[in-house]
Amino acid sequence: MNMNHENKDRREFLRSAAGLVLSSGLTMAQQPAPTPVPPPKKARITSSVMLWTLKGTFDEKLATAADAGIQSVELINEYEAWSEADAAKYKHIIASYGMHMDTILASHDWVKRPVSLVNPTHREAFLADVRHALSWAKKLDVPQIILMSGNVQPDMTHEAQYASLVESAKRATDLAEAAEVTLIIENLNSKVNHPGYFLTSAAEALKAVKEVDHPRFRFLYDLYHEYVQNGDPLPILKEAHPYVNVFHVADAPGRHDPGTGEMKWADLYTAIGKSGYAGYVALEYLPVPVDQTSSLIKAVTAMRSSLNAAQTPEKPA
């Protein structure tokens, strides 16, 4: 039996069923819990996609991810416009596809407001954003919240900004521990996509995670951003993997499909697979083909092939 075809048929059925439930006017409590589509057996690495990279309505993006066989989805701040009923609706739809939500973002408008980790005068506003994101994480059963360092403060030394980042992270981690949610800090490039961003080095992000030294503060290692800013992301990957909860994937230059640029994805995936890593690998690229579902299927298939080849037979991805 073709399991990929079977799972796709199942997702098509569940999507239709979810739509009928929601259009019928019945409440979530009146409906039986959906049966999730199971991930690959014995998987220890979970595939995900950052939904902002996909075209369409939010519902269409979810359907695209499900049709591609992706196991989880990442949000920015789409939930900000949701009512309690909307939150329940989307939890139901996502579960009906056999997926879950793995991350949301705190301080989505960090470029526009003084909410950075690197300036002590921004700290209370930053912590207020963390509290707000934690409340939504609990509502949506999201285990992780992405933190952005914020931009360089021109009137502060690099050392002072780094010290502030560590202190802000420690304060936020206390809040996250109480909520049983994990904070993950992301490296970004300032050369192309995010001019002025402070935490542009995976090595420095790793240093901060080690210094905070708490299981609720981890690293979101964006391989694309590291390549654009500093070159080959592989050396830091080999050191960082015990501290990473999420890897982000896009090729450079262009931030498009893996395999369309210069990055050596087979080597990167092999290193992740051999490392014993047991977290998320999330696609955060802008699909080149018109058919974004086919693009995601190709990317996920290549990723799983390399990961599985690198892992022991008992622990496939």
Segments the model singles out, each with a brief description of its role:
Residues 2-46, 50, 55-66, 199-221, ...:
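Histidine-acidic metal/acid-base catalytic patches
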Residues 75-95, 149-153, 193:
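Glycine-rich, proline-tolerant flexible connector loops at the mouths of alpha/beta enzymes
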Residues 53-55, 79, 107-110, 151-153, ...:
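Active-site-proximal loop/turn and secondary-structure-junction residues that shape catalytic pockets
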Residues 90-120:
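Mid-chain, structured segments of secreted extracytoplasmic proteins
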Residues 70, 99, 142, 181, ...:
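Short glycine/serine/threonine/alanine-rich loop segments
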Residues 12-25, 34-41, 96, 113-218, ...:
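Active-site acidic/histidine proton-transfer and metal-coordination neighborhood
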Residues 61-78, 141:
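Catalytic domains of carbohydrate-active enzymes, especially glycoside hydrolases
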